[in-house]
Structure formats: C-alpha cells, structure tokens
C-alpha cells in the first residue's frame, strides 16, 4: 500500500533538476549568442571533417553547448560538448 502513495507523490526533485539544467542551457545559449541554426552548421562542419578519418553514426551524434569550470579559477565558462559515436576507423595512407 505504501508503494501506491509513492507512485502518486512528487518525484523527489527530478523535475526541478531537469528544469534547472534546461534553464542553464538557455542562459548559456543566450550569453554566447548561439542560435540553434549555428549549432546545426557547426555539427555539419564537424561531421565533414571527422568523416575523413572515421565512419561515424550521424544519428547518434550529439553536440551541445554547456558550461564548465576552468581549472585555474573555478569560473564557469561556455563549453562545446560533442558525443560522436564511431562505427569504424578509416584506412588512411600518408
């Protein structure tokens, strides 16, 4: 019976955490003057360059703008994070 009450109770802050992360993302995009179109163009360029060296899973590719803390002063700064699934390495002769 107790599990039934848990089911209908609040989600222990999960929604709050998601909302906070979304707000952070909106603020980063606003502060860096970065539009969704810019991120899409950046993604296309990254795909072009990386595709010369590896075969990638473009569907699983994720690029986002976030914040990180600098090592030397712990100040938050914008960071470009790319998750690029690699299918296989390409053979290249030099």
Curated annotation (Swiss-Prot):
Any Pfam family matching the protein: MinE
Keyword Cell division: yes
Entry-linked Gene3D superfamilies: Cell division topological specificity factor MinE
Keywords: Cell cycle, Cell division
InterPro entries (alphabetical): MinE, MinE_sf
Keyword check for Cell division: yes
GO terms of biological process kind: cell division; regulation of division septum assembly
Function recorded in the entry: Prevents the cell division inhibition by proteins MinC and MinD at internal division sites while permitting inhibition at polar sites. This ensures cell division at the proper site by restricting the formation of a division septum at the midpoint of the long axis of the cell.
Family: Belongs to the MinE family.
Protein name: Cell division topological specificity factor
Organism of provenance: Alkaliphilus metalliredigens (strain QYMF)
